[in-house]
Amino acid sequence: PVRRPSARVVIVNWRQAELTIRAARSIREQLGGEDVLVIVDNASGDGSAERLRREELTVVESSENRGFGAGVNLGARGMVEEVLVLLNNDAVAEPGFLEALLRPLSDPPAAAAPAAATARILLAGRWKPAAPGQQDVLVSPRTGRWARVDDEAASRGEGEVLVNSTGNLVDASGNGYDRDWLVPAEREHSPSEVFGLCGGACAIRREAWRTLDGFREDLFMYYEDTDLSWRLRERGWRVVYVREAVAHHEHASSSGTDSPMFIRVNVRNRILTAAAHSPAPVVMQALARTLVRTLRGPQRGPVMTGLAQAVAGLPRELRRRTRGRARRSSTSAEHR
């Protein structure tokens, strides 16, 4: 039988020790003898680190909260394990998750072998189509508006299980999004090939992670996985979706999707990521889409702030793009 690779599992915590403990418990019992679980506490300052250590977890403390990407990079620093596995602190891994996620990465690195794998992430709870005017709903342009049913109704089997992600896609305006978002789980039969990984539950070979220098830290949060997926693709590396590796995710437990901070950072990072990787028409589409949102939408303030921050960062992204192409050309020349 093929030996499965060793794994370092990294979970990032910020002021949500109990959620993080739940996530850690779900994956800890799946670890093999060569695997390591590392919890990064992003300067919570609320006693989280001490609470996590009482669970006999390995905790690495950051001196400041520099965002999700920086937290993962800190947790992965110095790793000797063969694969880095990421699990959101507000997710729970089903039994067999780790074994299934690592299976496509068991073969030695080769041109045809995938460099990363992304899990089947389901939304926690059960959901039903939302009533007209109902608030606190999730929306998909493909499947409509959904409201979560209460725990009692869920225990009776009411509602449906919905997909959160089967990987990452990018549209014509540079918007990174989850494939199969809010598709009923029983209807999801997506292919294994996918553009990119979802950072909420995924795995990447150590060699690929090191070659790419991990996540971009200046994005702080959101779009780190889209940016990393772009860089994997630009190197010619594949990402595969593993349907058997299942995790359940409490959507937006760590930061609400309607908060001004979420909107500002999302707008900024979408444009910056498009500028770093996409063709010029996509960058223009991203800018145009944001201008339309600014004029029409109710969240003008944070959208405008995010747009201004993105425009200020465009020269840096174009330089990054040029340097990246030069590095890839140099690497290609070395291997010819």
What are these regions (language model features)?
Residues 25-34:
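Short, acidic, metal-binding catalytic loop of nucleotide-sugar glycosyltransferases
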Residues 239, 258-282, 301-317:
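Catalytic core of nucleotide-sugar-dependent glycosyltransferases
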Residues 282-336:
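Non-catalytic, C-terminal membrane-associated alpha-helical segments of glycosyltransferases
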Residues 84:
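Short aromatic/hydrophobic "clamp" motif used to bind/position activated sugar donors
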Residues 26, 41-49, 64:
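A conserved acidic beta->alpha catalytic loop
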Residues 195-246:
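A short, conserved alpha-helix in the catalytic core of glycosyltransferases
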Residues 95-164, 168-175:
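Conserved donor NDP-sugar-binding/catalytic core segment of glycosyltransferases
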Residues 62-79, 89:
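Glycine-rich, basic loop-to-helix element that forms the pyrophosphate-binding segment
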